[in-house]
Amino acid sequence: MKIVIAPDSFKESLTAQQVAEAIKRGFQQSIADVECLLCPVGDGGEGTVDAIRHSLDLEEKCLQVTGPFGQKEVMRYFQKEQLALFEVADLVGLGKIPLEKRNPLQIQTRGIGELIRHLISQEIKEIYIGVGGTASNDGGIGIAAGLGYQFYDEDGNALPVCGQSLLNLASVSTENRYEIPEDVHIRILADVVSPLCGHQGATYTFGKQKGLDSTMFEAVDQAIQDFYEKVSPATLKLKGAGAGGGIAGGLCAFAQASIVSGIDTCLDLIDFDKKVSDVDLVIVGEGRLDRQSLAGKAPIGVAKRTPVGVPVVAICGSLVEDLPSLPFENIQAAFSILEKSEPLEDSLKNASLYLEHTASNIGHLLNMPKI
């Protein structure tokens, strides 16, 4: 039996690669001569680039850039020939910022623009960027600063490059801006369709989880809108521009980037269609499968790309009651790995073992003679 194992990461627990390896161990315990092909995936959220780099065997490199509080910090990126990938969360992710320092209006993203300039200087032509899981809400002003834009208040004083400065922004200088060469293509791997502004935008949708006081939502949202009406009105209409606290919008406006489906691009990059052309079973999974998963998340994206006639089974941390009845979206069956009632902390810690057990049990079911 040949099985493709293509899970997303389990948030705050296991990377997609670790999930795939645990499931493989489970099948090896219960199915003789099973062939497991690991294809960790991501939909544009945090962990997507890490999943892709395992599948493509990319080389890890590092560059010193401006960190979230203005200090110098080393940032990773992954490269193969003229292709490079990196994840914004590697510099300004929620996990990188101590709780006591979490203020999305003070987090700086200038380093992202600096890294883009470096990659272009190294003859990179294809750049893929994951923008999920950020701690910032700067509307993309940091990206612009990293690409040479400068910002001033009413008195002509240079402003710090963070979201807070949008509230005092009076003018923008493009004198030293960096032009992206025409032969360089920058693509944003997105898993959300939030616009920059409005009640479905970056601030209202993600501000609270990043530590922004709700009393600030209206002022910050308006400041981002005012900023883009000055520099790039068209970006205000882009679906997905609100991803990463507006970093996606900044990349589109100042680096001529385009927003693409995170999961479909991931599957294209790892040549998923070829890998799944002659398999007996496909396994998908993520930490929590719910109705939101139906809107472009990894498990559904993988299932839709799986050929008709190849069964798809989901192995997830938890299954939420709002899911439609199975089968749905080409997924034939879904299993939660939770074995007992226990604190969330323990479930996260034991996830690898529970994945093994669940996969092993599914393997035993597959071994049963047809009834």
Swiss-Prot record:
Signal peptide: none annotated. It is an enzyme of class 2 (transferase). Gene3D superfamilies: Glycerate kinase, domain 1 (3.40.50.10350), Glycerate kinase, domain 2 (3.90.1510.10). It comes from the Bacteria. Pfam families: Gly_kinase (PF02595). GO terms for biological process: organic acid phosphorylation. It catalyses: (R)-glycerate + ATP = (2R)-3-phosphoglycerate + ADP + H(+). Its EC number is 2.7.1.31. One of its GO terms (molecular function) is glycerate 2-kinase activity. Keywords: ATP-binding, Kinase, Nucleotide-binding, Transferase. InterPro entries: Glyc_kinase_flavodox-like_fold, Glycerate_kinase, Glycerate_kinase_RE-like, Glycerate_kinase_sf. Belongs to the glycerate kinase type-1 family. This is Glycerate kinase. It comes from Neisseria meningitidis serogroup B (strain ATCC BAA-335 / MC58). The lineage of its organism: Bacteria, Pseudomonadati, Pseudomonadota, Betaproteobacteria, Neisseriales. The gene is glxK.
